[in-house]
Design a protein with these regions (language model features):
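Acidic, polar ligand-binding/catalytic clefts
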Residues: 33-42, 130, 139-211
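Extended ligand-binding regions for polar small-molecule ligands
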Residues: 40-85, 126-135, 192-208, 214-215, ...
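Bilobed "Venus flytrap"/periplasmic-binding protein-like clamshell domains
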Residues: 104, 108-111, 121-134, 184-253, ...
Length: 285
């Protein structure tokens, strides 16, 4: 969480914020700054989702993940997005242009794992699946859909692989088989810079005690159908009891962030890496 983000992703998220006319112009009286509550609230594993009837592809994906972990490729890709490296764009082939294609479904609203600049995809997941397609000798096709339909697209046979910063859990395992994990994540809160509610918190239990003290007048935003939603609203399949706050879903964490700047919600909850990107983009870092 302490590593600097790359300028390309920061600029891309800043463009998203400007596009909705809200960067550095919040009307909440707190100025234009936000902060990360730097306490991990969950422990999660990211993995790729594969169709349940495609054991051959699952085996190939797991072999590829083991290979990129062992030979340093995964570390090199992570360095591009969490360190000083330069992200490499990935361009989707036209679906159906050939018979030898790997069709990957994603939701390109989750930097630094998947995002778009024009027609080019960037992100940890996108570079990984490009490497996988090359390894398999296939053309890469990327389908960009709403997050809540990513795994269902694989389940229905519209795509071979789901790559969207997917947290492994039993609910999603009903739709797809998960590969071995390639990234460990957790949920973090974003607050306005002058918010003091969590200033004395040292542990996840401390943060949860504060969250439990809030009532429905406190609104917390999240990207819809992500772990953040289930953490806030509660979900037995995810093992979360939830809180008595009002949850509000968005198409992306960036949109939740700008709505917080506008004073419409109190906090945002999202995975660690996107949280840092959003905070740094809003704060102009």
């Amino acid at each position: 969480m302490k590593k600097k983000i790359t300028s390309l992703v920061s600029i891309t998220l800043a463009i998203i914020l400007v596009a909705v006319g809200l960067t550095a112009c919040g009307s909440n009286g707190s100025g234009d700054k936000v902060k990360l509550i730097d306490i991990a609230l969950t422990d999660e594993l990211y993995a790729f989702g594969v169709a349940k009837n495609d054991a051959e592809l699952l085996e190939a994906v797991n072999a590829y993940i083991a290979e990129v972990k062992a030979d340093g490729t995964l570390d090199a890709i992570n360095e591009k997005y969490f360190g000083s490296g330069t992200p490499e764009g990935v361009v989707s082939a036209e679906q159906g242009a050939s018979e030898n294609q790997l069709i990957v479904v994603t939701n390109a609203e989750f930097a630094p794992f998947e995002y778009k600049k024009g027609d080019t995809y960037y992100g940890v997941d996108m570079e990984l699946v490009k490497g996988l397609a090359d390894k398999l000798g296939k053309e890469l096709v990327i389908l960009n859909v709403d997050f809540d339909s990513v795994t269902s697209n694989v389940e229905a046979g519209y795509a071979d692989l789901a790559a969207a910063g997917l947290t492994v859990n039993e609910k999603r395992q009903k739709q797809v088989n998960f590969s071995d994990s390639y990234y460990t994540a957790s949920q973090y809160l974003i607050a306005l810079e002058d918010d003091t509610a969590f200033d004395n918190c040292k542990t996840a239990a401390d943060v949860e005690a504060v969250l439990s003290s809030f009532d429905s007048s406190t609104q917390i935003g999240y990207q819809s159908e992500t772990t953040g939603q289930y953490y806030i609203t509660g979900d037995a399949d995810w093992g979360f009891d939830g809180f008595g706050v009002t949850g509000k879903g968005y198409d992306s964490g960036a949109l939740a962030g700008v709505d917080m700047l506008n004073g419409n919600i109190s906090y945002v909850i999202i995975d660690a890496a996107p949280a840092e990107f959003i905070v740094n983009s809003i704060n102009g870092k």
